[in-house]
Amino acid sequence: MLYSPRLTDQILIVAGEASADLHAARTLHELQRLRPGLTAFGVGGPRLREAGLEALAPAEDISVMGLAEVLPRIPRILGILRMLGRAAAERRPKAALLVDLPDFNLRLAARLKKLGIPVVYYVSPTIWAWRQGRAKQIARVVDRMLCILPFEERFYEGTGVSARFVGHPFAERPPPGTPESYRSALGLPAARTTIAMVPGSRPSELKRLLPPMLEAAERLRAAHPDAQFVVPVAPTLDRAALEPYLAAHRTLEVRLVDGRTEEVVGASDAALVKSGTSTLEAGLMLRPMVVVYKLSWLSYAVARMLVKIAHVALVNILAGRGIVPELLQRDASPERMAAEVERLLGDRAAREAQIAALREVRASLGEPGAPLRVAEEVLGVMR
């Protein structure tokens, strides 16, 4: 059926993983507040759909991490790219808000540019870590680049990209409460040793990270018989996706919580957290943590050749030094995970030093109001 143009303003939004979905949803709320009647279509997760996005495809179909993981999904991903291009040509949105996911969104931006549709890109690609030459491509296809890390804006100087640091969306969050308050909110016993495990929002991350996390939990329980383990289930996942892994540890007390990652980490004495946005989300709760990640051997080999940074964890990058342990690939073993968590549980000086450094990271994220500033940028380019 042919699309019938609406009298209201309409924009295109594309967001992939859970954090991008959350940031985009908050921006859409601000856009609707500033411009009543504004509508949006595109690709998003549950939070964007709840905010009113007309989803032409779910975020889960384009949110894939790692070269080996992407290859079998290429036909579907390219199909969505073509479908969005056709929808944009037909509907002629007044602007596009593309959030993160550079390998997909920069290709889409090139198509939108040919259609004369202004593009606002939210969450800069990590050109400071690898493929700095992408800045030239960005300059050709993006009208406004909105950065969420304080050091990113300067990497665009002299490239022709109109970039602005808008503050980090997580700066909206109030200072964390006590572990006991979060345990009470989650229905957890207040006096027990509590360990959070954050395995990620993608099936591939669950497959690689949850089994060694659960093995580490078994080791920690042996040293702390009162220990309870809590896992937030990302909005992009179903609880059933975790069941096969939990089935191998029936005697281990693992509490699943839908979403609410910050509360789960806030309830913890220490946390195992997958690398990515989750590390910053967890770090803002000012709880000791260990960062872990595993890629396929092929994806990791390619990453080692291309990525030139000293640290992987976002909190370490922002701090400019290693403030939290990073366990990658073979080092992300149950033995190492359990040993690092045990150190944080037992060494008061190590705990306090890490928490003090995380306070510095929290202070570096800018002032609250990022969703409003992004919404204003989108309205500023609308035709």
From Swiss-Prot:
GO molecular function, one term: phospholipid binding
One Gene Ontology term from the biological process aspect of the record: lipid A biosynthetic process
EC number: 2.4.1.182
This protein's record includes keyword Lipid biosynthesis: yes
This protein's name: Lipid-A-disaccharide synthase
Annotated keywords: Glycosyltransferase, Lipid A biosynthesis, Lipid biosynthesis, Lipid metabolism, Transferase
Organism: Anaeromyxobacter dehalogenans (strain 2CP-C)
Species lineage: Bacteria, Pseudomonadati, Myxococcota, Myxococcia, Myxococcales
Record GO cellular component, one term: membrane
Gene3D superfamilies: Glycogen Phosphorylase B
Biological role stated in the UniProt entry: Condensation of UDP-2,3-diacylglucosamine and 2,3-diacylglucosamine-1-phosphate to form lipid A disaccharide, a precursor of lipid A, a phosphorylated glycolipid that anchors the lipopolysaccharide to the outer membrane of the cell.
